[in-house]
Each structure stands twice: as structure tokens, then as C-alpha cells.
Amino acid sequence: MKFSELWLREWVNPAIDSDALANQITMAGLEVDGVEPVAGSFHGVVVGEVVECAQHPNADKLRVTKVNVGGDRLLDIVCGAPNCRQGLRVAVATIGAVLPGDFKIKAAKLRGEPSEGMLCSFSELGISDDHSGIIELPADAPIGTDIREYLKLDDNTIEISVTPNRADCLGIIGVARDVAVLNQLPLVEPEIVPVGATIDDTLPITVEAPEACPRYLGRVVKGINVKAPTPLWMKEKLRRCGIRSIDAVVDVTNYVLLELGQPMHAFDKDRIEGGIVVRMAKEGETLVLLDGTEAKLNADTLVIADHNKALAMGGIFGGEHSGVNDETQNVLLECAFFSPLSITGRARRHGLHTDASHRYERGVDPALQHKAMERATRLLIDICGGEAGPVIDITNEATLPKRATITLRRSKLDCLIGHHIADEQVTDILRRLGCEVTEGKDEWQAVAPSWRFDMEIEEDLVEEVARVYGYNNIPDEPVQASLIMGTHREADLSLKRVKTLLNDKGYQEVITYSFVDPKVQQMIHPGVEALLLPSPISVEMSAMRLSLWTGLLATVVYNQNRQQNRVRIFESGLRFVPDTQAPLGIRQDLMLAGVICGNRYEEHWNLAKETVDFYDLKGDLESVLDLTGKLNEVEFRAEANPALHPGQSAAIYLKGERIGFVGVVHPELERKLDLNGRTLVFELEWNKLADRVVPQAREISRFPANRRDIAVVVAENVPAADILSECKKVGVNQVVGVNLFDVYRGKGVAEGYKSLAISLILQDTSRTLEEEEIAATVAKCVEALKERFQASLRD
């Protein structure tokens, strides 16, 4: 937000210079982005009056003028501005004046005519970029007065970054309140005298959406002169806040917006049919906006309508049909409180970001509307004339925000600040902030002011007290803590060790938001209810994630859209699963998840371009599981997951308990998410793996190992892992290694069957195994496979 320093000082004028004021505002939590003078450096420019204005005898586009600057005689000045005319009060740079850029004014002849000065435009004085003509001053501007003094150009524009919680500071009044509190000065508000109704004209107002619009004020003003010029003082204040003057009606509503932080809108009353209806838009309803674009509205968009059509997007943008134009004589002033949730996201949906939506999304003071209406009415009538009707107020008290009542405990205050502030000082700070304070024993009851939506809990009051007290006034205290060496179990597996392993395998760690798009999440976890946020950043970030896959897959799409087709990423973080048995109804599990897609290897002339498959990811996952020392207890079972390919996925079990999933993303989900090519994912519950098996020292056999290979034919649906597990189980004392080295389907193997080639490594720690013992153990394995899986040795 930009504002004029002098405008701020009209409300509160501390005895500090501009730099100190800017620093004070920053330390109060409103970061100052810049302080710039409102005009260039110049001197010798005064108010003058064009007494005579005649055509230059030797130039069609020049005029010869005589100008009164309050001296002994009139000055001859040649001017080329198209708006130069007799009787106009202007800014005159006299001989000896120095303009911005060190431009010195000297006596000269222009096309043969003497010129003893220059009539200046705004751009020539470094005030603005407007060079369309010379400055037109009011007819009562005192001749001979220094223009810097008359226009109050010894001023600065201060630009601040207002955080979303401080919507009250999106108006001069909010910044002034903070400066007044910090300097213990009274706030000098402009006198707003209510405008009595002089006519009975009204329009019927109906609010059909009280949750979205708890308060709506409307007032008819008839007989205005919309072509009346906006006073220079108002134009200058608007300009110094970065707003261009449009016309008197729009300028008045913008002025109230900047001064009080209350958005307003003016309708052409004669274009309203029947009356005002505040309602939600009809699905597919259209509205031509003030900028000429057509907006197609959704059913969740608030509109201001008449009895036949939508007139404006509530709290966002006005409509072209009902807008004020050069023919307007009667207006309806609107001043409303719209719920932030009813405005949030709607403007962005249509590519809009207006001053009104910016304020309504963050919250406007619900007690401000009557004051703003009276202020706007008075300014409008003073500038444009006209007569005002009564104010029509439609308020639904049940849906208006309630002021929070907060208890601040002395113990909490001292604990969080780390410094004792006297009771009377705490009370004074809270009252100066606008709170209604009741003192108790070692505590305060404070009712937050209506303009502070961010005061809700005890910590908010602690922050306010510390902020106003001054962070610089809180003494530095050394941290006092005992140095006690923590214990570390050898069985604890550090997540950092796992991350290092994945990094070594070419994965990159990412961190994604815990807030995800509920629509995308439903594609990945259909039918699973997620925790929805009451005040989301946006609609696309309104649900808490049920797994890390939602964010990871979005990251893959983001990279693929930027020509990064080989992606290997992982993430560790919490998922949030609704669970009635968990505290607060939400179970938070620490998860480890990863995604791979694209080529198996980086591009290289000596490496084939092979796409990653299920076994690439399964191999990486087994490396992770091997760090736990429990790989031999892990099973990969065929189990359906709606997000994964039914034939290329598996559930991961540890000691009979499911700990995760691995597999290829389901083709249908791949299509919906716009994934480019085969994408594989895994996810593990980390807490079920963090306790590793500590390796035990064991004797290494000094005797030779023996390898025997067998090929068994089993049904297609028999998992190879079960075959290997059975062999280990049968040969527990002598079989030290079992490996699957070939799978065959085809000639010699019946359809629906497969041949598994297995190597058995046999060894004893105390002696060399005899051939008869080896053969007996192999035979036991074969027999066990026949009995359990109906396996047969392949010929």
C-alpha cells in the first residue's frame, strides 16, 4: 500500500522525521518498502495567472501570454500547451528557477517573441508523467505563492507491505492508529458530520445471501453533476497513493477506500430495474464488467443484481451496464461488509485483482460501513452537488463477525516475552490498541476491536504488547540450558541415512505443501475423506494430504512441462488421516515416498535408452529396506490400490503388517494428471521401519560353499517370493542363499504356468558338506515345493 506522509500526519503527527517514522512503522510489523519524494527537486516556481493569451505570430502551435506572478509587471511567456487560456491559474517557472534535471530557466526568444519564464506541466516538475498540458490550478490559488508550498510538495510517498493479517492497515486510518499507539498520541480523525436526508427516494434492497453479505447499505443521491471537476487536493492525495483520477464520483469512492479502508461502489440509479438483490450467481450467468470483458459466473460467486440481471460482482468489480457515465444524474451509493470467504479466490478465477477484492479477502471492519457512507455522501455532495435520501441498512447480526474476548495471563505474557512489563503498562497498551479491557488477578480480559480480525487467541495479545512495548526495549538475556548428553540407541535408523542413500542413487529431495487440491486427491484416494481447511490459501490448497503422492506427482508434471522427462524425487513428511481413535480425530503419520519416471540412465552414447520399470523402483526400495536389517522379513504382495496399475504394483508387508505400496501409476490416473509416460511411485510408513535390527557378529564358514540349480514349473499366479521363502525355510541349517535367476514361459511349459530357475547355496560352518547331504537338502526343497505349490521339476 502507498500513502502520503503528509496525509498520515493529518491524523497523527509525531515529532520525528521521515526516516524515523519509516523505521518505526517497520518495527511495528508494517515493513516499509520505500520512501520517495512526491515531486522532483526544483525552486523558483510560483502561482501565476494568464492575463492575456494570443496566437504566436510566427508559429501555429505556440501562444504568446502575459502572466501575473504578483510582481511589478506582467511577464511575457511563450507557451505551447493546448490548454493555455486567459484567466487560468498556472505554475510559472520564473527566470532563475531551477527545474528537475538541473534545468535552469533563462530569458529567451522563441520564434522572435521574448519569453521570461515557463508555464509548467506536472511532468516538468517531476510530479507525475502527465505532460498533456500545463498544470491547471484552482481559481482561488493565491498569485505569487511558491508552488511547493501551495501543493504541499515537500512530502513523501511511503510504500508498505501489509501482511494478510493486518487488513486494517489497508487504509490511512489503520496505519495512523498504529503510529498513534507507538507514540502515545491521540488519533485526530476527520470530522464526519452525518448528511441528513433531504429527499425520500430509496431503492428496495433484498439480501438473499446473508452468510456472504451480513451487512449492506444503500443510499440514493439525486441531481449530481458527474462532470464536476475533482478538487486538486483530492487528486493529489489519490495520485500520491498511486491512483489515477477518473471522475468525481469514482474519485470520492477511491478516496474513502484509501482513507478508511472501506471499498464502495456507485451505481447509475436510473439503470437499476426494480431494486437491489444481493444473491449468489446463477450457474453460467454472465456479466459484462466495467473494463468491457465478459465474465461467466459460477454459483459460488456473490453478485449485486436488480430484479432482472446481475449488476456487479460483489466486492470485486462493477458491471458496465450500471456503471456511472457522463449522462448519470442519480446514483446509488453502495457500502457493504462481505464475508472474506465469499470473496476469496473469486477474483483470481476471472484474472482480476482489485483494490476492493484485496481488502474484502482479508477482512474489512464490520462496524465501518455507516461512517464510510456518511463520509462519501458528504464529499460527493460537496463536489458534485445533489440531494441525499435516507440510508437503507440491511444487517443480519447473526452472520456478522463477533469480536473475540481473550484472556491474557501474566504467566503466559512473561514466559513468551521473557521480560516483565508492569501491569499498568500492559493495560494501557491494550486500551490504546482499541481493546475493551477488564483487569483481574494476574490476568486481563480483552475484547478485540472490530477492525482487528487477527486478535483471536492469547498469543495474539502477547505479540501486540511486545510490539507496542518495543522489541528494542526487551533486554537481551542469555539462553540458559543444561548440556545433557542425549542417548542414542544403536537400533535407531536415522532418516538422514536413508536420504543419503537415495541421493546416492540419483534421487533429489523435494518438499511439497501439506495443503493439496481435493479434486486431485480424490483421484488418487477415491472415497477417502480428507480434512478440509476452513480458511484455505486457495481452492486448490484446501485439503490436508492423505499421502505424499499428491504433491510428488504434481511436481513430476511441473518438471515434465519444462522438458525434464527423467525425474527421480523423494520426500519425507506427514500425512493427515481422519481417525476417530486419534487425538482431535486426525492421525499424523511420518511417511517416506518417492517417484521415478523417464529413462533408466542419463543420456550417454554407450548406454541404451531404456525406460524405468517396476523392478528399478523395487530394487531401490529394497536397498532402503536393507538398511533396517529386516529385508528378509519383508513381503511384496499383490494387493489392489486405486492409484496403481493392477498388474504392476504390490503392497509391502513387514511381519504381516502393511507398511506401504509400490507400483506403476494407474493408466487412467496417469491420463487425468497429464503425466508423460510410465511413472512409478512408492510410499512407506517410516515409523514402522525406524527401529532397525542391529547386526550380530557371526562366524564366517571356513568351508566351501556349494551351488545347485533347479528349475521348477508352477502356476502363473504363484509368487516367486513364496518359492524362495519356502526354500529358505526348508533348508534353514544348510541353505545360506536362494536366488531367482531366470523366469521362462513358452515351449515346453504349459499355458498358465511358468518355469522358475533357482540357485541354492549350501554351506556348513563346522564341516565340508558331503554330496549325499547336499542332494538330500535339495530333494527336501523340491518336495516341499511340490507339496505346497504343486510344483514340478522341469525336464
From Swiss-Prot:
GO BP terms: phenylalanyl-tRNA aminoacylation
Domain FDX-ACB: 701-794
Chain ranges of the tRNA-binding domain: 39-148
InterPro entries reported for this sequence: aa-tRNA-synth_II/BPL/LPL, B3/B4_tRNA-bd, DNA-bd_dom_put_sf, Fdx_antiC-bd, Fdx_antiC-bd_sf, NA-bd_OB-fold, Phe-tRNA-ligase_IIc_bsu, Phe-tRNA-ligase_IIc_bsu_bact
GO CC annotation terms, alphabetical: phenylalanine-tRNA ligase complex
Broad enzyme group: ligase
Protein name: Phenylalanine--tRNA ligase beta subunit
Chain sites annotated for binding Mg(2+): D454, D460, E463, E464
Classification via Gene3D superfamilies: 3.30.56.10, Bira Bifunctional Protein, Domain 2 (3.30.930.10), Ferrodoxin-fold anticodon-binding domain (3.30.70.380), Nucleic acid-binding proteins (2.40.50.140), Phenylalanyl-trna Synthetase, Chain B, domain 3 (3.50.40.10)
Domain B5 per the UniProt entry, residue ranges: 401-476
Localisation: Cytoplasm
Summary of subunit composition and partner proteins: Tetramer of two alpha and two beta subunits.
Gene it is expressed from: pheT
